């Protein structure tokens, strides 16, 4: 019985550590990521709004490690190719912290953008109008 309880507790701990992020977390991460995209890629207001929604949808869809580079990641990148100009999309793909914004290591989710922009409270632009 003790062994079963131990296994269940370990399974629950593993499941909780790899759970999807909350809506609030996804919203904050999408805002930070999109703000830096707007700064580096010189996005217009319409592109900024659309990129925020795309990033938020992607972050909300990631529930497991398998989702990182699965269908929603491909949809995200395809959507980005529709809203960005050719030179912007090439720059987007060349920057790993934009192209693959999220990774999972040692049981935790990590955002590559923070290696380039460590000040998490500094924003270049205002919030998008769709930011609720």
Annotate each PLM feature.
Residues 23-39, 45-132:
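Low-complexity segments
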Residues 1-26:
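Bacterial Sec-dependent N-terminal signal peptides
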């Amino acid at each position: 019985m003790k062994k079963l309880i131990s296994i269940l507790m370990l399974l629950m701990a593993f499941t909780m550590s790899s759970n999807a992020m909350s809506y609030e977390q996804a919203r904050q991460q999408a805002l930070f990521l999109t703000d830096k995209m707007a700064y580096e890629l010189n996005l217009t207001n319409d592109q900024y709004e659309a990129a925020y929604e795309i990033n938020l949808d992607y972050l909300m869809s990631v529930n497991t490690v398998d989702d990182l580079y699965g269908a929603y990641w491909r949809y995200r990148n395809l959507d980005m190719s529709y809203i960005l100009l050719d030179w912007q999309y090439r720059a987007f793909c060349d920057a790993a912290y934009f192209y693959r914004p999220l990774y999972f290591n040692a049981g935790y989710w990590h955002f590559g953008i923070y290696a380039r922009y460590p000040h998490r409270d500094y924003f270049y632009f205002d919030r998008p109008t769709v930011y609720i």
